[in-house]
Amino acid sequence: MPAENIVEVHHLKKSVGQGEHELSILTGVELVVKRGETIALVGESGSGKSTLLAILAGLDDGSSGEVSLVGQPLHNMDEEARAKLRAKHVGFVFQSFMLIPTLNALENVELPALLRGESSAESRNGAKALLEQLGLGKRLDHLPAQLSGGEQQRVALARAFNGRPDVLFADEPTGNLDRQTGDKIADLLFSLNREHGTTLIMVTHDLQLAARCDRCLRLVNGQLQEEA
């Protein structure tokens, strides 16, 4: 039976530096996210939102505390086990888009579906449809270096969508995009949630996007507070 709680966090702390130079970023985060929820993480720039998102996705570690992802405690896992867990269950879009530089846009987007076991034709058709939806139908054969920053962002989002993950972590998914494109991205995010039950956890400064989520959590002084 799939875990009811996609993410579970207790007493999470994160500090950098040592001694008098030590800086506390997270000071005791508590969080439970149920399967299928949509969560917005908001807060001032530099408050630690991106750091928290990376820890939740198993890409970074806290200094202390417990984090579980799809029912699996991350502190018990080595990086190989975490990578397998992410490949099976997790999609993510961070501000560094992590596109494979030697693959073109279409190949980058179809990769998650191939890893999931879809046929080459299925994965390619799905990837092409997503890229066309995002206005990149004429950029299918372009390498990441040949795309603008906004275009790379859309490719990264399409790749995450094409994996149909159990949970999608997104850092400013509509940042640096015009309102029309941002609204299209938001609609795709919530269709992924609605049609596939994907849990969404996103850092955003976009108040319209945050308002569409089930819960909006503000990171203040290293701890989460629920917004009204």
From Swiss-Prot:
Domain ABC transporter: 7-228
Pfam families found in the cross-reference section: ABC_tran
SMART domains: AAA
Alphabetical list of InterPro entries matching this protein: AAA+_ATPase (IPR003593), ABC_transporter-like_ATP-bd (IPR003439), ABC_transporter-like_CS (IPR017871), MacB-like_ATP-bd (IPR017911), P-loop_NTPase (IPR027417)
Residues holding ATP: G43, E44, S45, G46, S47, G48, K49, S50
Signal peptide: none
Descriptive protein name: Uncharacterized ABC transporter ATP-binding protein YbbA
Organism of provenance: Escherichia coli (strain K12)
